[in-house]
Amino acid sequence: MPSNDGMNYAPDGRPAPVCSPGDFVFAAAGLDHGHIFGMCNGLIDAGGQLRWVYDPDPLKVASFVHRYPGVEAAPSEDAVLQDASVQLVAGAAVPADRVALGLRVMDHGKHYFADKPPMTTLDQLAQARAGVASTGRKYAVYYSERLHVESAVYAGQLIANGAIGRVVHVMGTGPHRLQAASRPPWFWERERFGGILCDIGSHQLEQVLFFGGSDEATITSARVANYAHKEHPTFEDFGDVNVVLANAVAGYCRVDWFTPDGLGTWGDGRTVILGTDGYIELRKYIDVAREPTGDHVYLVDKGGEHHLPVSGQVGYPFFGALILDILEDTERAMTQAHAFAAAELCLTAAAQAVRVEG
């Protein structure tokens, strides 16, 4: 995975299968975003068997098959959906098209694993909720900046164990490198990507809910701007939002497309979680000017100051839990309510945001 390319962020984990070979079969459909590689890597490491891939672009399919030699290129989407052995379809279509794909998947009795953002409008969210209710299938979401980042996984464990007491504030920053020349046309169209708070903001707002311990939140302010890309009038290169959760935890998120060329990775993503007995800072992808590696956890508690480098130490339990949820009809990886609550918060923030001109 190129460290400078956030669009193709796909961590390589360690195999930790939760099932026997052939017990869990999945397919990939919709290759518009490189997150599909991280989604597939996680499921394969957890014991999943990748059987099919489909996309209308044969070049994308050829690249995918080269990366996963055991997968078969499907002649059509319908060939994937008609295969009764396929239990889940992972999809990273253009954001505005993700719900339509998911509805087709669930209507064929299969579970759906969508890249973030899982939809771009509140109407699409209503359709997805209705689809889940009518089919009984899961609509899982790849909020990768928590699920596929070991420092974030470890922070969740620390909080659950009471390391910093009661959480009172969560702050997340998610800067990304633009790499404009590599972006497809839909990337610049707000109607297609959903707005910056819906798109990359979804990573941060989901973490506020998770670390803050509530799926209910009120937006107190939200802003977006297009400071440096006027040639794309509907694009947004900056956004921030303040929220208050139902349990009184406060949160702040900032996202942007201004990672400078001098940074050694695609974005200096950080999270700071304040508790009554201490605080945690995550330096997810780099420790600037100190360490080129990521997954640094800084913990300050009653006992002192602690630097915990956790890369390669924690793993990514979400994927195995998702497979077991499907095989055993449970809900341990992430509740459907949480997946949709995070999406709704992002969509509401995008809709309410004041656009700053300048």
Identify what each model region corresponds to.
Residues P2-P17, E206-D287, F318-D325, T330:
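Contiguous beta-strand/loop segments that form the cofactor/metal-binding neighborhood of enzyme cores
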Residues M1-Y68:
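N-terminal Rossmann-like dinucleotide-binding module
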Residues M1-G22, L88-A90, A246, A321-G358:
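C-terminal helix-rich "cap/oligomerization" subdomain common to oxidoreductases
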Residues A96, M119-A181:
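A contiguous active-site-proximal alpha/beta segment in oxidoreductase catalytic domains
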Residues H148-G172, C198-Y227, G239-V249, Q352:
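Oxidoreductase and adenylate-handling cofactor-binding alpha/beta cores
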Residues P17-C19, Y68-G131:
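Beta-loop-alpha module in the N-terminal Rossmann-like domain of NAD(P)-dependent dehydrogenases
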Residues Y142-E150, Q179-A217, P233-F238, H338-A339:
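Mid-domain beta-loop-alpha active-site segment that forms a flexible
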